């Protein structure tokens, strides 16, 4: 299920960023080309009662780029009209964002906090 959620997140990010060059770096390999999406940490809270057919997934996505405008543009696209923006439409709710800048490396970091519900029974159920 984690792989499916990662795939869905990649699709969502691609839709949000449009033409911005972006690299999805879920393995932690470093790259300075375009935006880097890394540190996708997920916590799955299963619905133990069985009343509902989905689990709640929370994720923190760290976006790193030497270009602060790209980071701002991406965050704006993802958080636009929250909770009814692009994320909400695809079942993901962006619940917050934080920004930091590293004067030593010149990299700008946006960490997005995400909450989403995924089908606990797998695709097609």
Predicted region positions:
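Contiguous hydrophobic segments
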Residues: 3-10, 58, 120-125
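Small/polar-rich, solvent-exposed N-terminal microdomains that initiate assembly or binding
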Residues: 1-51, 69, 73-80, 85
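Oligomerization/assembly interface segments of phage tail-like spikes and tubes
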Residues: 52-69, 108-119
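Acidic-leaning, charged glycine-interspersed low-complexity segments
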Residues: 80-125
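Ser/Thr- (and often Asn-) enriched beta-sheet segments in non-cytosolic proteins
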Residues: 21-23, 41, 53, 58, ...
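Short, surface-exposed loop and linker segments with low hydrophobicity and enrichment for Pro/Ser/Thr
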Residues: 31, 48-55, 101-108
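Low-complexity, flexible helical/coil segments
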Residues: 57-62, 70-78, 95-101
């Amino acid at each position: 299920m984690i792989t499916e959620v990662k795939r869905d997140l990649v699709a969502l990010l691609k839709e949000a960023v449009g033409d911005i060059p972006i690299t999805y770096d879920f393995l932690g390999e470093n790259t300075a080309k375009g935006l880097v999406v890394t540190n996708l940490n997920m916590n799955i809270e299963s619905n133990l009662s069985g009343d509902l057919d989905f689990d709640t997934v929370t994720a923190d996505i760290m976006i790193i780029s030497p270009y602060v405008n790209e980071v701002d543009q991406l965050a704006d696209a993802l958080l636009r009209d929250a909770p009814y923006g692009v994320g909400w439409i695809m079942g993901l709710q962006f619940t917050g964002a934080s920004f930091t800048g590293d004067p030593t490396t010149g990299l700008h970091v946006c960490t997005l906090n995400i909450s989403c519900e995924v089908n606990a029974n797998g695709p097609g159920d």
